Amino acid sequence: MYSSVYLLLSIVFVGGSNAHDWDSFESHHSEPRLRTSNLDVGEYCATFHENYVYYCRGIWTAEKLLEHRSIMKKIGKFCPSYKSACVTRTRIDPEEERERKEDHKKELTDDVGDMAFDDLMRKLEKIVPCRPNCNVSVHPHCTRQCKCEYEYHRMQKWCKPPRIEERFKYFCRIWYMSCSTYIEELDPEMADAFVSQYANYGNYHG
């Protein structure tokens, strides 16, 4: 439910004690004016509550039907709109809502309990990507291998051309040594050069 309700009302609520003031307006004008208002949900519900009680919940006698026949189309639109915004929304039992949330949580945990470890890790990767700054003590799936896989395609744009540009060598060297699984993709001479210079650089993944 949005925090505000935007209403284009073809029925004007005339501030009085009687909800059927709608009809007093109808009797003096050939066409109803359009009133545009931007109301908070609570303001909308409070303002038009009397109209809802009178038109949507009151008993419709033959006399009442005859009296308001000219605005029946408007009433037909107003009643479900008000009910959706103000009545159905507020009838949620707090206890039922709590139980619903607990049941939903149980369904999620049951699903996780039935998953294999690798499947669970893959599911977690979709929720929290294995970026280099992902803390493995907080997110256990953020292992070095997971971080390497996450960065792999991006790093290949810079680190696997026929010749690596000088400005990228520092980062490529650190990445390949931190993600040694992929170092065999380099040609032997480049791999040897990276290994021989590794001691002078830090660890990409900390």
From Swiss-Prot:
Q: Name one GO cellular component term.
A: extracellular space
Which InterPro entries does the protein's record reference?
Answer: Notch_signaling_modulators
BP-aspect Gene Ontology terms: positive regulation of Notch signaling pathway
Where, by residue number, does the polypeptide cross the bilayer? none
GO MF terms listed in the record are:
Notch binding
Q: Which PANTHER family match?
A: DELTA AND OSM-11 HOMOLOG PROTEIN 1 (PTHR35015:SF2), PROTEIN CBR-OSM-7-RELATED (PTHR35015)
Instruction: Quote the protein name from its UniProt record.
Output: Delta and osm-11 homolog protein 1
Q: Which organism is it from?
A: Caenorhabditis elegans
State the encoding gene.
dos-1
